[in-house]
Regions:
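Active-site-adjacent segment of SDR/Rossmann-fold oxidoreductases
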Residues: 22, 28-29, 138-140, 156, ...
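Canonical Rossmann dinucleotide-binding motif of NAD(H)/NADP(H)-dependent dehydrogenases/reductases
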Residues: 2-35
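Substrate-binding pocket helix/loop in short-chain dehydrogenase/reductase
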Residues: 59, 107-108, 112-117
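Active-site helix of classical SDR
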Residues: 131, 167, 175
Length: 302
């Protein structure tokens, strides 16, 4: 038996990268899959039906069930059509994985409004549209799963990706709130921060040494790794898992901390600006988060 036997899932951005592998792995685990992909370029331009259809053909050739959809997650009514396709074709919908995305990388001082808005629309608005179009169905059937896609660009930060990072940090917060709101109706949501070699990561500028290291890591950083985690989280075996942020990169799986106060300093009557500069900031400095990549977490071999 497959881990997703009897499940119907929707995968946006399912024609390439992480979405492609998620759709294929889910089908191997018994799910019926709606493979959505507009087929746009990395910057969101254009459209191409072949990526989504190719994944459907792969699934069907292996004996699975799938149907393609070519709409955009930026349009709520279009996402509604994706949901209706699942209901009409397969008789239900149980989980959604939403890695559909684009990039418009630029330093903040050079970024245009259009570059900012394009990222917010596809990533953050796209995640909202998916939830808004499916949450009523999930609540009614008292069951549903969201796998949302955050990024270390938001959770940790990455130069040149202020738009993308802000959207991805927003997705982490959105996932947490959907998990809180959905708990009473058995609706789960988790966010994933993947490290995988895809056409999106290939577009990120890097020096020659980093590029060589990246190429050597391509197999280890396969998009199959986060796809396997997404499928596991959509299964009934993970019914108790919600509101979490997971990282996956290469052979490693991580669980992220979520923002909570580290220390609180109280002053009778409250703090004025002079007191903050004199007494609060010097005391708080030991707990500041440094810029740059954080120290590696402890690795536990299993």
């Amino acid at each position: 038996m497959g881990m997703l036997d009897g499940k119907v899932i929707l995968v946006t951005g399912g024609g390439r990268g992480i979405g492609r592998d998620t759709a294929i792995v889910a089908a191997k685990q018994g799910a019926k899959v709606v493979v959505n992909d507009l087929g746009a370029a990395i910057d969101g331009a254009g459209a191409d039906k072949s990526p989504a259809q190719e994944v459907v053909d792969i699934i069907k050739s292996a004996g699975g069930q799938a149907i393609a959809n070519f709409d955009s997650v930026t349009d709520l009514r279009a996402v509604g059509r994706m949901v209706q396709t699942a209901l009409d074709t397969f008789g239900g919908l149980h989980a959604v994985s939403n890695p559909a995305g684009i990039l418009r990388d630029r330093m903040a001082h050079n970024m245009t409004e259009e570059e900012w808005d394009a990222i917010m629309t596809v990533h953050l608005r796209g995640h909202f549209n998916v939830v808004r179009a499916t949450i009523g169905h999930f609540r009614s059937q008292q069951d549903g799963v969201y796998v949302m896609w955050s990024s270390t660009s938001g959770l940790i930060g990455n130069v040149g990706q202020s738009n993308y990072g802000a959207a991805k940090m927003g997705i982490a917060g959105f996932s947490r709130i959907v998990a809180l709101e959905g708990a009473r109706n058995n609706v789960r949501s988790n966010a994933l921060a993947p490290g995988a070699a895809t056409r999106m990561t290939d577009s990120v500028p890097r020096d020659e040494e980093t590029a060589k290291r990246r190429e050597a890591m391509r197999e280890i950083q396969s998009p199959l790794r986060p796809a396997e985690l997404a499928v596991a989280l959509m299964s009934d075996a993970a019914k108790h898992v919600s509101g979490q942020i997971f990282g996956v990169g290469g052979y490693n799986l991580s669980i992220y901390s979520q923002p909570r106060p580290i220390a609180t300093y109280q002053r009778e009557g409250g703090w004025d600006a002079a007191g903050i500069v004199k007494d609060f900031l010097p005391r708080a400095e030991k707990d500041f988060t440094a810029l740059g990549r954080p120290a590696a977490a402890t690795v536990v071999k299993v």
